[in-house]
Amino acid sequence: MAPKAPLKNLLLGQFVMARKVGIDLGTTNTVVFIPKKGIVINEPSVVAISVLDNKIISVGNLAKEMIGRTPDSIITSKPLVDGAIADYRVTEAMLKYFIKKAGGFLSFVKPEVLISVPAGITSTEKRAVIE
């Protein structure tokens, strides 16, 4: 019987493989790709926000389901409109949510992220995505 690899090495190996993330930040959908896993997320670029405390309530499919069905205290927003970033804060929150949802990342090590953005993005918007 072959000796088993220590659990630490197995976990570290899985983590190293999942350190890179590709994101297609589109006006309609956001797609997240992880090498050797493929597309792990393909959800609408929609965010639901609480007007009362200005907090993000849901992102993606759940937020899309809320369009037209929310009370006055909740708004749904598409942070990208006509190939441009309409709301930087909401776009940032959406990106963080999708990266976290893609999973497999330790909180103290940031993944390498490649983000594809709409062609009509301005230099200011490009800088905001990079930050």
Located regions from the model:
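Nucleotide/phosphate-binding catalytic cleft detector across ATP-hydrolyzing
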Residues: A2-E131
